[in-house]
Amino acid sequence: MAQQYQPGQRWISDSEAELGLGTILAQDGRLLTVLYPATGDTRQYSLRNAPLTRVRFSPGDQITHFEGWKLTVREVEDIDGLMVYHGLDGQNQPRTLPETQLSNFIQFRLASDRLFAGQIDPLSWFSLRYNTLQHTSKQVQSSLWGLGGCRAQPIAHQLHIAREVADRSAPRVLLADEVGLGKTIEAGLVIHRQLLTGRANRVLILVPENLQHQWLVEMRRRFNLQVALFDAERFIESDASNPFEDAQLALVALEWLVEDEKAQDALFAAGWDLMVVDEAHHLVWHEDKASTEYSLVEQLAQVIPGVLLLTATPEQLGQDSHFARLRLLDPNRFHDLAAFRAESEHYRPVAEAVQELLDEGRLSPKAHATIQGFLGAEGEALLAAVSDGDSQASARLIRELLDRHGTGRVLFRNTRAAIQGFPERELHPYPLPMPEQYRDLPAGEHAELYPEVAFQAQGEVSDDERWWRFDPRVDWLIDTLKMLKRTKVLVICAHAETAMDLEDALRVRSGIPASVFHEGMSILERDRAAAYFADEEFGAQVLICSEIGSEGRNFQFAHHLVMFDLPAHPDLLEQRIGRLDRIGQKHVIQLHIPYLQEGPQERLFQWYHEALNAFLNTCPTGNALQHQFGPRLLPMLEGGDSKAWDALVAEAKGERERLEAELHSGRDRLLELNSGGAGEGQALVEDILEQDDQFALPIYMETLFDAFGIDSEDHSENALILKPSEKMLDASFPLGDDEGVTITYDRGQALSREDMQFLTWEHPMVQGGMDLVLSGSMGNTAVALIKNKALKPGTVLLELLFVSEVVAPRSLQLGRYLPPAALRCLLDANGNDLASRVAFETLNEQLESVPRASANKFVQAQRDVLAKRISGGEAKIMPTHVERVAEAQRRLAAEADEELARLTALKAVNPSVRDSEIDALRKQREDGLAMLEKAALRLEAIRVLVAG
């Protein structure tokens, strides 16, 4: 044993192949010392069981000298235990290369190289590699890729918009859904799908400063997107020449950006594929002048290919403001406001005719004439079929009209009236007496709306004099919570100080378990607070949130909402109710509103309830009414004549009813149909729910965790705790937290427990783990004993896995046409391929592991035979590879040609189809076909099977 090792010999570590070639330094008693020059590491091993494999190359192998030149081996000589290789260099000159001068950086990654170098992996790893290939192949072809992994209930109109927009090259669209319909989720889905498919690599998100945190939370929690939040401090402190270039996704406040010219210059220079602008209706534009914010976004939109604008509904904004948004998307198409107004009027009668067809199932003579005038001679046959009662013809007619709709491809707008599934609301007001302590408070911003804040600001008071000792709203809250025991209650107040004080009050005065949630807490602390509230068995009954702290959070598992105070703007009121009032809420929303009489709180309640009707219904006119009546409203909240107050409320109510009637009459059902997807979105919902019910992912992940040394243990129903074990294989495994993480595969659980990771095929942990398997050599060699009575002992079968590989930009999405599915070959001694007769799973059940030393010994003895069979296997599988590539080219060409024909025909009737979109698709077709032509067959893995 001692003579097996000689100083200067080259060996490779079985457990740390990344160290490169090792050199024997010394053998001292029972210890062996090995230097790994590539990394500078030294290891000592026990002589008895050193995990090392001797590096021996054979004639035909190509090896590398430490100076970089290569040698093709012709002859191998053993001189005193050291290998000397003779052969030809790159200039075909005879040279000699002693093993002591081999490159230290040689790593055996190719399956055949590793097999013959004795680097044989556990049997389970080979199965893991095969299954990883199969799952990757299935996912990249899935129509749900980028849509199914969002931590949200799948909703038809959101999925339809996301797929329609994200599947375009450099989409430029306006998302103008009514409040509560999920514009942020739609934008997140578009971003996520574009990133996963490679259509976009760098995304810029511009938002108002007060929405930055909400976007950060939404992108991270729902989509696992790590967004870099930029502000003046981060920008100044960065050492990079351009701080934006380091961020794949940047979140920037527009208010800061317009004030900082250096940041603007850096932003323009960074290069982006997609820009998302939230609250785009605040960008002010008039025909003769534009605001600084509008001009900045306009300049960015001229250099960034893809643009998503999130905005209020067109009816809320008015036509001129709506035109200003469309002008940002396509200034060539929308260049003349007067022409746009005329075009909009042109479409209105058509939309009304469609409304009639939908409501009545038939067309009146007037509606018939309107549509005939719009479609011309092409539509006569279709209209005749509709008149005969053909329902399929009606559907085709609506599709034809949708295709011709002036803004149908650039504007998506859903309304609550068109979308089903929202809960009802019930209002419970509680007028309470004004405490004496609040009657003479010092003046301040909204001091009497939030008297507890003004009271506390007067200075330190004893514990017995704190505001929550005398404020009747606190007594009412304690009584209400006791009455609603075992029912989850969300309490929202305007200020973080109030939220923290209320937690103290409940703990001291009632012992009711409460969780608090405010902007002073870290995201992790908020997650824990939300999880404590969500826990049905041991969690808090009540969660007390501040206004800002609750932004972007979903608490729809609760249906009781207490507004401890009222916000100063109707949009904030709607945001509060929106924490619970979402599609999928199973209960009637119970709104509990305590307010202090004889002051601003009482009048603000009356304003929201009687003037705006904002408690029982969404208030799309709230912002416009606040803008119109705000200057008169604010002074009257503080006091004033009751008759004048009643008159103001009545006037505002009348104006609201007038605006709502305008909104209703202006509804464009044609646009709503296009935005809702006319059934296509529902099919996506059903596919996602079906995928959720499958067990393929949990089964696969358990094998992945086992292979990488990740321990999993039960946390609770549908939840697991993952922790790195002492035998963790790779520290780069994307666990997310070195201490451990809690996961669930259940969507419902993930929606109520935001502290848990929601694992889907799209999750970074899943994708990162799969990448670690396929990007390295893990599992690409194995040797096993096969127990089968039909096989004579000693019979050798060779199982080969090949992959058709195409190297191309991800944006071409060639994986959809040529996925990395394993091409499997199972060769017997005569070179016959048995793969079609023996399935992978069937074969797996008959296999047993072989000790590595025995496996290596067998492989070395059979090296020449196995090498010959591997070459024969490649020849066997090549025709299948050629056919797969040809089929991929046929599918790509057919899909691209169909879409090109559709867009070209559409452009003839709808000017919203951009030439650049058609040109990009045509180029993508050409590039994709050219790249597929270069697809190569690669040996992915080898398994040697010996009958026993």
Swiss-Prot record:
The keyword Nucleus does not apply. The lineage of its organism: Bacteria, Pseudomonadati, Pseudomonadota, Gammaproteobacteria, Pseudomonadales. One of its GO terms (molecular function) is hydrolase activity, acting on acid anhydrides. It comes from the Bacteria. Keywords: Activator, ATP-binding, DNA-binding, Helicase, Hydrolase, Nucleotide-binding, Transcription, Transcription regulation. InterPro entries: Helicase_ATP-bd (IPR014001), Helicase_C-like (IPR001650), Helicase_RapA (IPR023949), P-loop_NTPase (IPR027417), RapA_C (IPR022737), SNF2-like_sf (IPR038718), SNF2/RAD54-like_C (IPR049730), SNF2_N (IPR000330). Pfam families: Helicase_C (PF00271), RapA_C (PF12137), SNF2-rel_dom (PF00176), Tudor_1_RapA (PF18339), Tudor_RapA (PF18337). Belongs to the SNF2/RAD54 helicase family. RapA subfamily. PROSITE patterns: HELICASE_ATP_BIND_1, HELICASE_CTER. Its EC number is 3.6.4.-. Residues 473-627 form the Helicase C-terminal domain. The keyword Transcription applies. Interacts with the RNAP. Has a higher affinity for the core RNAP than for the holoenzyme. Its ATPase activity is stimulated by binding to RNAP. Residues 164-332 form the Helicase ATP-binding domain. One of its GO terms (biological process) is regulation of DNA-templated transcription. ATP binds at D177, E178, V179, G180, L181, G182, K183, T184. A motif (DEAH box) lies at residues 278-281. Transmembrane segments: none annotated. PANTHER family: DNA ANNEALING HELICASE AND ENDONUCLEASE ZRANB3 FAMILY MEMBER, SWI_SNF-RELATED MATRIX-ASSOCIATED ACTIN-DEPENDENT REGULATOR OF CHROMATIN SUBFAMILY A-LIKE PROTEIN 1. This is RNA polymerase-associated protein RapA. Transcription regulator that activates transcription by stimulating RNA polymerase (RNAP) recycling in case of stress conditions such as supercoiled DNA or high salt concentrations. Probably acts by releasing the RNAP, when it is trapped or immobilized on tightly supercoiled DNA. Does not activate transcription on linear DNA. Probably not involved in DNA repair. The gene is rapA.
